[in-house]
Structures are given as structure tokens and as C-alpha cells.
């Protein structure tokens, strides 16, 4: 299997729709920060309530994930974003370049933090998927606007750039993809974003080009979580991608799941009581402790 084959999508279109499987299609929206940590408690509660309403928009037919991407940007990429000037603004351009160098010298590491929401639906074909994805996209953008969050939809080239920057961290090569190059080159979109190789021969990490990486899975089962848990992850001064996968569950399925969980807990409790009796403990005491 090639490195390209290890990237799990079928095609990405110019309009930003990605066909992940024969029947699953996605789009991605980039969004900005809300200044949550510096807000007072009343504002924090209002922000929290707003996000709850935002999440409640998604029904069980829409799968979505939040992606928080922290990547070290090369100094050259910053400088490219500041075009050279030979006019009255030349001194400003030099000053900006100097600031970049000073920040990196101070150990800022040039970490660039971006945030995305990717949503997907199941459909028989692109013709039926496209209009529904566009309706969901409009709703999400309106919901972000109500939260006071700026957001924009990524087109196909922009989605490929995000993947390129993650998968090719080991190379300073710029992202040079252009749609018009595909027909005459005989290449696919994956050829522009895939690393030189993937190597999955170790238990706790893998190799992606010349970089070593590791993936951890966190299943959230706690009834309460600190509102700082995500911030603490993203404050790590290193290349890190945090994905939060969310799947809404319809009410009937949720009730069935709760009942099944209660039944499993009751069974476990009975088994523990039986073990206690066999060990010579009083079953009533064991039940009380449970």
C-alpha cells in the first residue's frame, strides 16, 4: 500500500466537498476564537449556553467533528505572507520581518493555531449530497454569526492545503497544487499532500516521512469536565492536532442506550454480590456499599 492509499478519502472537489466513502460526503468550515477564558463568569455562562444551542442544531443524520490544529510555521512562510515592498511601505515590511525573527528568538516556536468544523452526511451520490450540505453549511455559518464567531467555508484547494501542512511537516516544500495541473500531470490530489512514506511498525508511534508521530484516543465518560481541558491540550508548544468527534443520538436510541446501560450495571452489581457471598461477606452489606 502506498502513502497515498493510506489517506482515507476518494476525492476532493473544487467546491470543497470531500467524498470520504462511496456514500459519505463532508465539508469543512474554519472558525475563529471566542475570548472565553478572559470573560467573567456571567459572560462565560452565556457563551456556554450559546454553544449548547449551537451543538443542538445537529441531528443524528449529521456527523461532525471539531479539529484544533497547532503547527509550527516556518519563518519563510511568514515572510512569504508579507510581500516585499519598494515604496513608502518598505520600512513597515522590514519591521514586520524583524518582529517575526524576535518572536522566534524568544522561543515562540512560530506555532500557528487554527480551528475547523467538519460535517458530513450519508447520500447515494453527489447530486443528492450537494444541496443538503449547502443548506447545513448556511445554517452553521448563521449559528456561528449568532455566537459572534467569524467563520468561512474552505474550498477544495484550502482543504488540501490543511492536509498538506499536517502530513508534510518534515519538508519545507510549499503547497503548489493547482486544479488545472491535474489533467496533464496524471497525478491525483493525494500526490500533492501525501508524505514520502508511512511506517506503522511500532506499537505506540508511527513514522510519517521523516517525522515521528503518535495518536491517543480519549473517551469522555466523566459526568463533568473542566472547561480548561481543551485549552491545556492546545497550550502544548508543539505540533498537535486535537479532534473531537461528535455524534448526536435521537431520543429513542438514547433511551434504549440508557436502559441497556442500567441493565448492564444491575447485572454487574448482582455478580459482585454473588462474589461477596462466596467470599463469606454479608450480601446486604455488599449491596449497601455498592
Predicted regions: what they are:
Residues 1-290:
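Extended, folded cores of ATP/NTP-driven motor/assembly subunits in large transport
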